[in-house]
Amino acid sequence: RVLEENSNVVASISNVKYFGPNLENIEKDDLFQKFKNIFKYRFDKPTKFKQVFPAYGLYGKKATLYLRMDRSTGLYAVFRKPIIRKSMIVHPFASSDLAIILNVLKHGDFHVIDEILMEKYIGGYSSKGIIQTLKFQNTSYLEIIFMSMPFTSWCAKNLGWKIFLKNFDWF
């Protein structure tokens, strides 16, 4: 309904609640679990932070918000079909899910319904960590070592230099 009534909104999603057997382990505060989470590039606790964010206004502001929050749950939104088609990444790389969201934001605003209408399972293959996921995808060791380079290069080319340099400390 939001997409029908607001032509500037290109995607809409509700807040998301996580569930699953791994949630308890990720939420633990013991030293071993903290080390394990860091090794898997898991720096936050899913139940403590919002996973989707409304983004309205100028592209630079929206891009900065999503870069800083570094969440890809927004991919589960309902999108305008022509916009999501234009926003897809042809050759995926680590963080290409975030790149898709950044592409979508170029075309308009991202609406979030302020209630939980969706639950997301926190498990499956990607819960083993980013390095294991990249190995599963037959990523070379060099690409794993420099896993952020393709995304950084993509941002330099696609965000525009002003937005890229403004957020340079994030990279």
Segments and roles (model prediction):
Residues D30, G60-D70, L142-F146, K162-F168:
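Short secondary-structure transition/capping segments
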Residues V2-K40:
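Conserved donor NDP-sugar-binding/catalytic core segment of glycosyltransferases
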Residues D44, I116-F164:
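Catalytic core of nucleotide-sugar-dependent glycosyltransferases
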Residues N37-T133:
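Conserved nucleotide-sugar donor-binding catalytic segment
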Residues V16-N22, T47-F53, H111-D114, I145-K157:
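Low-complexity, flexible helical/coil segments
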Residues A99-V104, L165-F171:
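C-terminal/domain-terminus segments
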